[in-house]
A protein has these predicted regions:
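Active-site rim loops that border cofactor/substrate pockets in soluble metabolic enzymes
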Residues: 1-3, 60-79
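Active-site gating loop/helix substructures
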Residues: 1-27
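Short acidic/glycine-rich loop or secondary-structure boundary segments that cap or lie
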Residues: 28-31, 65-70, 101-105
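Charged helix-capping and loop-helix junction motifs
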Residues: 33-40, 72-77
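A short helix->loop->beta-strand "cap" motif at the edges of active sites that frequently abuts
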Residues: 46-56, 148
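Structural beta-sheet core signal
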Residues: 58-60, 95
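C-terminal functional extensions of proteins
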Residues: 71-185
Length: 185
């Protein structure tokens, strides 16, 4: 049977002032929820409200997911969301970048377009090697061209480099909420 959205969840989305997509796996956590009939429409209703429109934030992943988002950069993540119903609905993309991970970001791989190419991309790559999602100045500008305001911050947990640091994320959320509030005035 086809997936159906829980009516109370759709109501809450329509009434929301702040909608957050992520952090999470792009193709197995975030986008599948957008494919459920009614979810994107509820986000659109909240976002397009005349009085007190909702602000929609996307929290970009810190690192690629083996077999899912290999080689995708920050622009690719936001573009994937726009191609899955979120065009014109994303206000801010929270993107990670810091001096320690930037050198690692240069070791990313081109996105797989055909699964048969997977062997080529993984050849010589050590299992468990971390590749942070690339976020160069040029890519951040491309995110802006999609109509999404990028907010670039150091968000990594120094103890667990594939996790967001919850305190850094909380501070960034406070900034986003302040930006959304001032935009609505």
């Amino acid at each position: 049977a086809d997936a159906q959205a829980y009516p109370a969840a759709l109501r809450v989305i329509r009434e929301a002032n702040f909608i957050v997509l992520g952090p999470g796996s792009l193709f197995t956590s975030i986008i599948p929820n957008l494919l459920v009939p009614g979810v994107v429409e509820a986000i659109r209703e909240a976002h397009d409200r005349e009085n007190d429109p909702a602000c929609t934030l996307f929290v970009c992943s810190l690192a690629d997911m083996q077999g899912e988002t290999w080689g995708m950069n920050c622009y690719d993540y936001v573009d994937a969301l726009t191609r899955h119903g979120m065009r014109g609905l994303l206000d801010i993309a929270l993107i990670h970048r810091n001096a320690k991970t930037s050198p690692m970001a240069s070791g990313v791989f081109p996105a797989l377009t055909d699964y048969s190419d997977a062997r080529w991309y993984t050849k010589g790559r050590r299992t468990g090697k971390l590749a942070h999602v690339e976020a160069t100045d040029e890519l951040v500008e491309q995110v802006k061209e999609l109509g999404v305001q990028p907010m670039v911050r150091d968000l990594v947990d120094p103890e667990r480099p594939t996790w967001h640091d919850r305190e850094k994320l909380a501070r960034a959320f406070q900034e986003v909420l302040a930006a959304c509030h001032s935009r609505q005035r």
